[in-house]
């Protein structure tokens, strides 16, 4: 079974519209390596799982799990954020993730704008028998 963050990475990296702004090699899972934390390498994306838990039980077996994902987008300009973020939101919505929180700030560590968005989805547990 693929981890939820891997599923999101695949969704984002295989989209041509998003790839025209963010090189798929600039989409990171969990952390951005220090060598890649460079303003000249922006825009970039980081995907983190915030929380997950099983739900919807039948006969004492979980049928689904709920997962919260955070996607951080770093850009050099506000215009880049305005162009890229709607693509991410649309892709997540098309894949049954509902956006429920966001924050926009200037990352003082690397002097880039950071758009952090949180998404939630309920996924079926794929039981292989």
State where each predicted segment sits.
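Acidic-leaning, charged glycine-interspersed low-complexity segments
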Residues: 85-129
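Small/polar-rich, solvent-exposed N-terminal microdomains that initiate assembly or binding
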Residues: 1-52, 56-58
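Oligomerization/assembly interface segments of phage tail-like spikes and tubes
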Residues: 63-76, 113-123
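Short Gly/Pro-enriched loop/turn and capping motifs at secondary-structure junctions
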Residues: 53, 76-78
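Short, charged, solvent-exposed linker or helix-capping segments at domain edges/interfaces
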Residues: 56-59, 127-129
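A generic structural micro-feature
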Residues: 39-41, 61-65, 109-113
């Amino acid at each position: 079974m693929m981890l939820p963050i891997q599923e999101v990475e695949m969704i984002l990296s295989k989209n041509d519209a998003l790839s025209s702004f963010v090189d798929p090699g600039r989409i990171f899972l969990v952390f951005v390596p220090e060598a890649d934390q460079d303003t000249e390498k922006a825009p970039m994306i980081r995907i983190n799982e915030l929380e997950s838990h099983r739900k919807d039980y039948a006969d004492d077996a979980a049928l689904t799990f709920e997962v919260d994902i955070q996607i951080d987008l770093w850009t050099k300009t506000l215009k880049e954020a305005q162009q890229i973020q709607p693509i991410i939101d649309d892709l997540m919505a098309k894949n049954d993730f509902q956006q429920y929180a966001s924050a926009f700030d200037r990352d003082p560590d690397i002097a880039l704008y950071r758009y952090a968005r949180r998404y939630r989805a309920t996924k079926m547990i794929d039981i292989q028998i």
